[in-house]
């Protein structure tokens, strides 16, 4: 499967027609003005979110892994980090924003094959990452598939990274 095939599959899927960005509803006003900013871009635009997704340790890890200036998107509306943000109270009014799969064509798109700031997670250009994504499980109804829950858990850790400010329309 190539990038165009993946984008087409996302757009026509009955399960996930978008890729997603999770945040707290309190952050929508700045996103309407500036788009979805990376952690590095936020202070440059004088944007200081009241409810952030990462804690100080994750921000340090993001810098170490070279993803601090990336915008994070995910493939499902059930990302493990979103769950942690709700549980820890970092996103009391959490929402998922549906983002067009067209952003996958932007230069610099990478995929973290796991939690992006974990030291052992591979981060690959999207074209190289596609063969590692469980497309069948993501975009078809296969809840009775072998090893459904471990496979789904792995998918819920994937993260797309972008080095630009994406403004949702």
Locate each region found by the language model:
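Active-site-proximal loop/hinge segments that shape catalytic or ion-binding/gating pockets
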Residues: 1-72, 79-169
